[in-house]
Amino acid sequence: MLSGDEFARRAVAALKPRRIAVLSVHTSPLAQPGTGDAGGMNVYVLQTALQLARRGVAVDIFTRATSSSDEPVVSVTDGVTVRNIVAGPFEGLDKYDLPTQLCAFTAGVLRAEAVHEPGYYNLVHSHYWLSGQAGWLARDRWGVPLVHTAHTLAAVKNQTLAEGDRPEPALRGVGEQQVVDEADRLIVNTKDEADQLVSIHNADPARIDIVHPGVDLDVFTPGDKAAARAEFGLRADEQVVAFVGRIQPLKAPDLLVRAAERLPGVRVLIVGGPSGSGLDEPTALQDLAVDLGIADRVTFLPPQTRERLAQVYRAADIVAVPSYSESFGLVAIEAQACGTPVVAAAVGGLPVAVADQRTGLLVPTHRTEDWADAIGELLVRKGAGFSRAAVEHAAGFSWSSTADSLLSSYGRAIADYRAPQRPSTQWASRARFRPRRLSGLRR
């Protein structure tokens, strides 16, 4: 006989959606991570969609078209489709301008769904607050639950802002509060992020699910360091510290370059492209290396494919993640899966992604001297079991496990949605409605 808890667990698991709409307004899952606004969220959206499709859930991902050459519909694989919605000009729109295009984007999403019979989607999963605004309306129009993943919060980013970086606007905080109030379930990467949602936005803890992101354990594996170094023209006998990510103040690649000045003989490998406020001075990092007199020890590479990125991790002795804010840190997990220890800032989800003193070192400050000391220490200690422990640690973060946890959250969202409705929120009535479909109209 099943216990009450086990019966409830199986009942929720049985509520698996057939088809979901995933909203990612500001960045496409098909974009190359490390360029523009493409980063860990792109990887998350695509990899979870692929895993959900393998579990029998069809996934339509809606994103804003950014080129006239974008096909309206792109089939990624059986069960995963990307739909490029025209909303505003293709080029020249900053992410901070996108709230002006939310009406156009949402209209495009609703029109795409309107050609189908009612009930085509069983659930909406929005990523980032812009998508949450669109998802809120789609949820009410379609009569299905809304699951939301914030990925980052304006208040958290502003509390840990890099010097000279642009703060998040107040309107984002208002928009995030609305989405938190309206979402049926909230997905976070770590308990720390859950606590932030509760303390900053007064989220109901009962509606929050902690779901760790994953890593592709088939791509990111240990490999031949000598071959990897040869691929990038690195000497076999030099010490290499790599940075992978968007080049912007938030990610703090300049901190690594400054630390390298204090570490004679250490080569820094920077992999990524300018993004966000980093676009204001696209050559600032190169100029810094010149000013410090270490330009000959700093190598720059453009964003890489996943397979080439795995080679970057294998070529490095250490991967550095000096971000001022990081909700999780996929780069840290990918590097460890390749057997490379990590030096990371002790912020956000990085203390979960990196096991301090076992798979790498966590640095509690952003002082150059502290980072130079930590990197120097790990370069000396890296042979003391760090690589083996890193691989073992990363093995606990698979996209397969992430997808299973998402399905459990979806099941709870569907179960709660079918249950008696909660009272209206402070923002608006939660009443579900579906517009009457008018035949004979050309869209």
Swiss-Prot record:
InterPro entries: Glyco_trans_1, Glyco_trans_4-like_N, Glycosyltransferase_grp1, Mycothiol_biosynthesis_MshA
Entry EC number(s): 2.4.1.250
Protein keywords: Glycosyltransferase, Magnesium, Metal-binding, Transferase
Binding of UDP-N-acetyl-alpha-D-glucosamine, residues: 32-33, 40, 246, 251, 304, 326, 334
Keyword Mitochondrion: no
Catalysed transformations (reactions): 1D-myo-inositol 3-phosphate + UDP-N-acetyl-alpha-D-glucosamine = 1D-myo-inositol 2-acetamido-2-deoxy-alpha-D-glucopyranoside 3-phosphate + UDP + H(+)
Transmembrane segments: none
Gene: mshA
Subunit structure: Homodimer.
Sequence positions that bind Mg(2+): 313-314, 316, 340
Binding site for 1D-myo-inositol 3-phosphate: 26, 37-42, 95, 128, 152, 172
Species, as recorded: Mycobacteroides abscessus (strain ATCC 19977 / DSM 44196 / CCUG 20993 / CIP 104536 / JCM 13569 / NCTC 13031 / TMC 1543 / L948)
Record keyword Metal-binding present: yes
GO molecular function: acetylglucosaminyltransferase activity; D-inositol-3-phosphate glycosyltransferase activity; magnesium ion binding
Family, per entry: Belongs to the glycosyltransferase group 1 family. MshA subfamily.
Protein name, per record: D-inositol 3-phosphate glycosyltransferase
Described function: Catalyzes the transfer of a N-acetyl-glucosamine moiety to 1D-myo-inositol 3-phosphate to produce 1D-myo-inositol 2-acetamido-2-deoxy-glucopyranoside 3-phosphate in the mycothiol biosynthesis pathway.
GO BP of this protein: lipid biosynthetic process; liposaccharide metabolic process; mycothiol biosynthetic process
PANTHER family: SULFOQUINOVOSYL TRANSFERASE SQD2
